């Protein structure tokens, strides 16, 4: 599985996630604006953090 792993609005980068079945994108807002984090897996998130998990290559941009 290949997942995007760039932060927020940086240029897209990807990494190969061996053994993973999900990519994730999570986002929240703070004083800097909207923060977006992407990577492998499907983490648990705190209340107030939005999470989208998906199962295809590069699905989490």
UniProtKB/Swiss-Prot annotation:
Keyword field contains Disulfide bond: yes
UniProt keywords, alphabetically: Disulfide bond, Ion channel impairing toxin, Neurotoxin, Postsynaptic neurotoxin, Secreted, Toxin
Summary of the function given for this chain in its UniProt record: Produces peripheral paralysis by blocking neuromuscular transmission at the postsynaptic site. Binds to the nicotinic acetylcholine receptor.
Subcellular locations according to the entry: Secreted
Site (May be the main cause for the toxicity difference between this toxin and cobrotoxin-b): 56
The family this protein is said to belong to: Belongs to the three-finger toxin family. Short-chain subfamily. Type I alpha-neurotoxin sub-subfamily.
A GO cellular component entry from the record: extracellular region
Name used for this protein in its record: Cobrotoxin-c
SUPFAM superfamilies reported for this sequence: Snake toxin-like (SSF57302)
InterPro entries linked: Snake_3FTx (IPR003571), Snake_toxin-like_sf (IPR045860), Snake_toxin_con_site (IPR018354), Toxin_cobra-type (IPR054131)
Disulfide bond positions: 3-23, 17-40, 42-53, 54-59
Tissue expression remark: Expressed by the venom gland.
Misc. comment: It inhibits muscle contraction with an IC(50) of 0.20 ug/ml.
Record bears the keyword Disulfide bond: yes
GO molecular function: ion channel regulator activity; toxin activity
């Amino acid at each position: 599985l290949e997942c995007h792993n760039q932060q927020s609005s940086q240029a897209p980068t990807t990494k190969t996630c061996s053994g993973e079945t999900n990519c994730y994108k999570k986002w929240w807002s703070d004083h800097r604006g909207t923060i977006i984090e992407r990577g492998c897996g499907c983490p648990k998130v705190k209340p107030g953090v939005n999470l989208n998990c998906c199962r295809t290559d590069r699905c989490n941009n």
